[in-house]
């Protein structure tokens, strides 16, 4: 991370203009070393060049950088600026909210994602089930768990399977937790 940031600085000092791929790489480096200051400079440059609206991967990298630097509110701002969002974009925000203990925001974001007809994936389901376990909400978790079970996803992904068992256990549905546990291919 630090080496990439130093290389980027040298590139700028040499008068070379970064392209979107360079920005994505440096944002990942900023996220990995939690360099908010450099990340904010990059964000300003991206906005100055008007690159955010047309590059989804750049938007995803910015959301990720702000989440990893501890600023979910800034990640939300970037998210709202994006004209196009995919499951990775939504997952970045949902994962970040859960990571920072903002469970209600994660669930609200998931609801918006579903209302915009974006299909959840294993990452989405894992985060939402974790959120439901944190707040002990079987009412919200059960329909999500039903989708996961219907698709057989919990048998294909060990993390999702464990999170499903954990959610049921934290919600007090120990019998259901044991049933799911018994169906896991790897224990």
What residue spans do the PLM features occupy?
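Pentatricopeptide repeat
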Residues: 4, 19-24, 39, 54-55, ...
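Long hydrophobic segments that form regular secondary structure
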Residues: 70-85, 165-187
